[in-house]
């Protein structure tokens, strides 16, 4: 079976392998490209006479019969990497799947606070709901333009601990007075979550504040060789500037 895979890749998929070398190894001019081996963790491609690059699968292949699908998934990822419209839709859906968000804030005394807060949205604007007694409140109040938020995939849903999908934004925080905007945001939150677990109770607590999150530039990482910079409504593939990682190309 392994010999058939190697023969097939070398006979029919040299261009696909060149795409993989470019995406995962920053190899822009590859010659004498050859598929060398495959194992449950990944593949090895040879190029330029005496060099090789190992590329890991997104998840371990348990059955050798599934090598074909794992290799196809790798090859298809090259084209999908440049499907920026698809990435834009994925970013939107990823954000909408969260009811809380990770925060990094700068406390007035200079130390950084890492925390999380419940997340609300009216369909266009995102908000967090924060108590004055929370440690991150002082940072949001005193340094509202020095905030980062992160949407981080649940580890139990990720293909690997090092492949957790994440979306991070530099963010401006704006405090919203209680009124029409407050009610619209909180009504949407209750509708989405069902309002259980104390959510309806904290709505009336006056030491809690609704804070709008105005996202600035960000980065979306969805897997190996799949990082994207975000600025407003524009998305750019990081790899277009050259792969940022250094690889050990074996001879």
UniProtKB/Swiss-Prot annotation:
Transmembrane portions of the chain: none
Any Pfam family: DUF2470
Keywords: Cytoplasm, Heme, Iron, Metal-binding, Oxidoreductase, Virulence
GO molecular function: coenzyme F420 binding; metal ion binding; oxidoreductase activity, acting on the CH-CH group of donors
Gene Ontology cellular component list: cytoplasm
Protein biosynthesis found in the keyword field: no
Record annotation: effect of changing residue 166 to A: Loss of activity
Reactions mediated catalytically: heme b + 3 AH2 + 3 O2 + 3 H(+) = biliverdin IXdelta + CO + Fe(2+) + 3 A + 3 H2O
Induction: Down-regulated by iron.
Location(s) in or outside the cell: Cytoplasm
SUPFAM superfamilies hit by this protein: FMN-binding split barrel (SSF50475)
Sequence positions that bind heme: 245
Primary localisation category: cytoplasm
Keyword Lipid biosynthesis: no
Entry superkingdom: Bacteria
Signal peptide (UniProt feature, chain positions): none
Disrupted-gene phenotype: Deletion mutant cannot utilize heme iron for normal growth.
Major enzyme class: oxidoreductase
Self-association state and partner proteins as the record states: Homodimer.
PANTHER family per record: HEME OXYGENASE HI_0854-RELATED
Family under the similarity heading: Belongs to the heme oxygenase HugZ/HutZ family.
Function: Involved in heme iron utilization. Catalyzes the degradation of heme to biliverdin, with the release of iron and carbon monoxide. Release of iron from heme may play a crucial role in the pathogenicity of H.pylori.
Record-given protein name: Heme oxygenase HugZ
Annotated organism of origin: Helicobacter pylori (strain ATCC 700392 / 26695) (Campylobacter pylori)
């Amino acid at each position: 079976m392994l010999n058939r895979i190697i023969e097939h890749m070398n006979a029919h998929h040299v261009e696909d392998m060149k795409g993989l070398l470019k995406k995962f190894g920053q190899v822009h001019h590859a010659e004498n490209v050859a598929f060398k081996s495959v194992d449950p963790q990944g593949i090895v491609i040879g190029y330029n006479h005496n060099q090789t690059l190992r590329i890991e699968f997104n998840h371990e292949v348990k059955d050798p019969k599934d090598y074909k699908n794992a290799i196809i998934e790798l090859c298809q990822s090259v084209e999908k990497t440049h499907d920026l419209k698809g990435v834009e839709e994925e970013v939107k859906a990823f954000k909408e799947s969260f009811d809380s968000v990770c925060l990094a804030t700068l406390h007035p005394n200079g130390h950084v606070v890492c925390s999380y807060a419940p997340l609300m949205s009216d369909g266009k604007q995102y908000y967090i709901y924060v108590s004055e007694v929370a440690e991150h409140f002082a940072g949001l109040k005193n340094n509202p333009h020095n905030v980062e938020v992160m949407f981080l995939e649940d580890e139990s849903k990720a293909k690997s601990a090092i492949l957790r999908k994440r979306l991070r934004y530099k963010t401006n925080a704006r405090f919203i007075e209680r009124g029409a905007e407050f009610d619209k945001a909180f009504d949407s939150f209750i509708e989405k979550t069902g309002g259980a677990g104390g959510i309806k109770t904290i709505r009336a607590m006056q030491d809690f504040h609704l804070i709008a999150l105005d996202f600035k530039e960000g980065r979306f990482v969805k897997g190996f060789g799949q990082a994207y910079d975000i600025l407003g409504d524009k998305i750019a593939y990081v790899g277009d500037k050259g792969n940022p990682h250094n690889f050990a190309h074996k001879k």
